[in-house]
Amino acid sequence: MTVKLGFVVAEFNRDITYMMEIEAREHAGFLDAEVADTIYVPGAYDMPLAIKKLLERGEIDAVVTIGCVIEGATQHDEIVVQHAARKIIDLSLEFGKPVALGISGPGMTRMEATERIDYAKRAVESAVKMVQRLE
């Protein structure tokens, strides 16, 4: 069975999320998974609605989120990631389908974010493994 993935990709810090998306797509191909649809959103905080839209489509087996939240002068990065992660978990449970957290951050510098680009592959792997193990 080919696992059909939906990607939700944040455009904020696009220089980094673009590279994360490329890594994720390549790894999906390596795992014989298909990226059936991709929705681009402004930032990580905007992901839950796009995730819900993908999960409502019956053909999507799992969703992979791709985002990068870099530390700023305030705690904004922590708030964004905490709330996005909580809602992402809620949507996974509501729809009974895996939603892999491929959002790097909070509390990291741009350099650290660049070093963690390959974390997107881990999110793809998590999504595919969960679909296979829950069948």
From Swiss-Prot:
It catalyses: (2S)-2-hydroxy-3-oxobutyl phosphate + 5-amino-6-(D-ribitylamino)uracil = 6,7-dimethyl-8-(1-D-ribityl)lumazine + phosphate + 2 H2O + H(+). It holds the Pfam family DMRL_synthase. (2S)-2-hydroxy-3-oxobutyl phosphate binds at residues 73-74, 116. One of its GO terms (cellular component) is riboflavin synthase complex. The active site is at residue 76. SUPFAM superfamilies: Lumazine synthase. 5-amino-6-(D-ribitylamino)uracil binds at residues 12, 44-46, 68-70, 101. GO terms for biological process: riboflavin biosynthetic process. It comes from the Archaea. Keywords: Riboflavin biosynthesis, Transferase. GO terms for molecular function: 6,7-dimethyl-8-ribityllumazine synthase activity. Its EC number is 2.5.1.78. Pathway: Cofactor biosynthesis; riboflavin biosynthesis; riboflavin from 2-hydroxy-3-oxobutyl phosphate and 5-amino-6-(D-ribitylamino)uracil: step 1/2. InterPro entries: LS, LS/RS, LS/RS_sf. Belongs to the DMRL synthase family. Catalyzes the formation of 6,7-dimethyl-8-ribityllumazine by condensation of 5-amino-6-(D-ribitylamino)uracil with 3,4-dihydroxy-2-butanone 4-phosphate. This is the penultimate step in the biosynthesis of riboflavin. This is 6,7-dimethyl-8-ribityllumazine synthase. The lineage of its organism: Archaea, Methanobacteriati, Methanobacteriota, Stenosarchaea group, Methanomicrobia. The gene is ribH.
